[in-house]
Amino acid sequence: QEAEYSGVTMAEGLGRTVLHRSRFARIWGLGNRSAPVAQTPCLISASNDPEELLSIAPFRSSQTRTIPAKLTIDTVHCLTPPNFDVPGPVFEASIGHVLPPSLDEANAGESADSGSVLPLSWQRLHHDASLLVENLKPHIVVLVDAVQLAAQSGKLVQAIHVIKNKFPGALLWTPGLGGPDNAAVLAWFGVDIFDFSRAGFAVASGHLLTAFGPRVPLDGEECSSSVAVTHYDQSLRSVRSAIASGTLRTLAEQQSLNSPKLVEHMRFFDKLVNKSNNVMRIHPLGVDRIDYLSTTSHQDSSVEQWVDFISNQYQVPEKLDNVLVLLPCSARKPYRLSKSHRKFIQALGTNACHEVMVTSPLGLVPRDLEDVWPAAFYDIPVTGDWSRDELHRIKSMVCNLVDRHNYERIINHSGMDLEIEGFDVIDTRQGERSGSRNALKRLTDAVQTAKEELR
């Protein structure tokens, strides 16, 4: 469905093309795909916003004071296909009656419009059957009660997740919620359009809203709308750069530390995405490394789904489930290209053993899967120390792997203490370095003995 929205094939509406993607985040090129005039994540201005913002925001918004209110979104750019020769498009929609999200069992009555701009609220997502129509393809979705949802546990990410799955090709705006201090987090969830409301309120109260959170200006530092716009613009530029380079998750984790609420949103989002089954299907285009630098990143859905797959679905290649050899990981990927693993392979002297690398946060990486995403692309800080959670995860995965296969011998060269019921695990390290001469000789001897005894 996303492809149906993209590019310049539409006869009307908003021309846009996906330039980069990172999970739910997108950089959309706005206008003619051969020469986009703007990119998302971007700003949307209101009539009372500072001039500096009006000059860099590709969208403008206005809202009537009627009940229900009418929302208008337009642009000074020529974004309407196929010719892209006149300013536009101009979208209008009634917001309808919006009740507080806490009244999720209530029906607001008069619903909002359904068209090129689609205003949504928590109630509408629960009660409006017209949203199920297959040919409903909005250009912009506006989550009108985003601020209220952010104050209620888990509801914001639930609403965004539903919207991004139902309307993947629509731009998403969460009015009043975005700012330079949370742009990376919201973009990671899938938000595309940001307004100046919070940044403006901060300036009015004598504070600057920056990518690192709100702060009081330093002595001699100007606290003005112009400075606030600069901080906002730089924050969105950093977000776009992170999407393009595949590092948005890392930036979002850093920015989530600006407030407890952002950490809460990240955790709820991870739990929600972990329930889906499509995260590991696609290697993000242009991404040659994924960083798992913090304990928070260990809860990312790419990790959780890998752990679940290895623990419950992975099947050892035929005739290899006889001797299990546990090996340490290496910084270089794929592992076999590293100096240490070349030594291990030489010491083993056979490909008849099932080689499995012990690592964090993925837990276990079988040799036959070392070239796939994310196993071949992750990077972690290496200290040689294991946390309690890491030890529990790895030991649990080893036990699950052993329970589902017919191993007769387990050789442990990983350096981790492992006890597995029903097995006398052979420790070939015995406290020495994995690449030491004695440890490698013990590895060779253990494999040779297993081959002779298990013929």
Describe the residue ranges of each PLM region.
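Positively charged, amphipathic N-terminal segments that serve as targeting/anchoring signals
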Residues: 274-406, 414-415, 435-453
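Glycine-rich phosphate/ribose-binding loops and adjacent secondary-structure elements
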Residues: 97-223
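Conserved, mostly hydrophobic/aromatic
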Residues: 36, 186, 246
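Non-catalytic, usually N-terminal nucleic-acid engagement modules in DNA/RNA processing proteins
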Residues: 5-114, 288-318, 330, 335-348, ...
